[in-house]
Amino acid sequence: MGRLILEHTLQGHKGRIWGVAWHPKGNVFASCGEDKAIRVWSLSGNTWSTKTILSDGHKRTIREIRWSPCGQYLASASFDATTAIWSKSSGEFECNATLEGHENEVKSVSWSRSGGLLATCSRDKSVWIWEVAGDDEFECAAVLNAHTQDVKRVVWHPTKDILASASYDNTIKMFAESQLDSDWDCTATLSSHTSTVWSIDFDAEGDRLVSCSDDKTLKIWRAYHPGNDAGIATPDKQSVWKCVCTLSGQHSRAIYDVSWCKLTGLIATGCGDDGIRIFKETSDSKRDEPTFEQLTAEETAHEQDVNAVEWNPAVAGQLISCSDDGTIKIWKVAD
């Protein structure tokens, strides 16, 4: 059994902390929350400290933040219905653009692999795709109204311009740009959860997706592409996503976030029961019928709901979490 070792407990925000995001280099992270502020933290020696506080970009709670793949830009999604884009061009972080269009709370934001596209989603049930048109210029490329309820999360595929979204309507949807007319289309709907899908994450290759839900389960989905050797039909030459594994019984409340480590293959969850759990694929797992086991769990990782978990993209086995209890914690998975 592995163990989850607590390395750091950090405080600074007032009220609940909604989101944390590692910088691509792994030596900096950002956090956001109820206090309408973003904090940028960096590591010097063995100490994490706040280097910058960005407090003038939003009028309401900041729900999520994400670094661009190049690490130069930070996007923040807020309950004030806007998404702000920050960069450090002059040595200090500044808000360079504010993206408006959603009717109410923006719940999630995600950069595409190239950094050329940005996706946002909202309680208004829509997903917006923005093109980065140049210096601090963002143009709306698509407004996607495929979901019937609040959209909780958007995540880009790790290698392709395919977007996944998760919703209060219990489904996950995939979107891609049509080869014919450059319109964005919904190419797949993933239905198996019986309640809100809170979060999703792709594996390193992007052929599998993990989802977590209010129904207290984790699900693993696999993409079957046209011409696949499993004999799965692919109508309209679109990839089909099938649920190939369901993990239940480990969580006692809603699972709010999930992160699939691109370095180790481990899956981490943040739960409404205050716990963090780590899952790994078993050694005898099959491609079309994968099996996962719980490697370790920290049942009282936080004193209240765990809102976000994210694996460090550059340091294998390092995990960050944040909570309604107003703390950020950094963990290390040890053998």
Curated annotation (Swiss-Prot):
InterPro entries, alphabetized: CIAO1/Cia1, G-protein_beta_WD-40_rep, WD40/YVTN_repeat-like_dom_sf, WD40_repeat_CS, WD40_repeat_dom_sf, WD40_rpt
CDD domains in UniProt: WD40
Function: Essential component of the cytosolic iron-sulfur (Fe/S) protein assembly machinery. Required for the maturation of extramitochondrial Fe/S proteins.
Alphabetized UniProt keyword annotations: Repeat, WD repeat
Keyword Magnesium found: no
Cited Pfam families: WD40
Listed name of the protein: Probable cytosolic iron-sulfur protein assembly protein Ciao1
Organism domain of life: Eukaryota
Alphabetical GO biological process terms: iron-sulfur cluster assembly; protein maturation
Renumbered ranges of WD repeats: 12-51, 57-96, 101-140, 146-185, 192-231, 250-289, 301-335
UniProt-listed PROSITE patterns: WD_REPEATS_1, WD_REPEATS_2, WD_REPEATS_REGION
Similarity comment: family membership: Belongs to the WD repeat CIA1 family.
SMART domains with a match to the protein in the record: WD40 (SM00320)
Gene (name only): Ciao1
Lineage, opening ranks: Eukaryota, Metazoa, Ecdysozoa, Arthropoda, Hexapoda
One Gene Ontology cellular component annotation held by this UniProt entry: cytosolic [4Fe-4S] assembly targeting complex
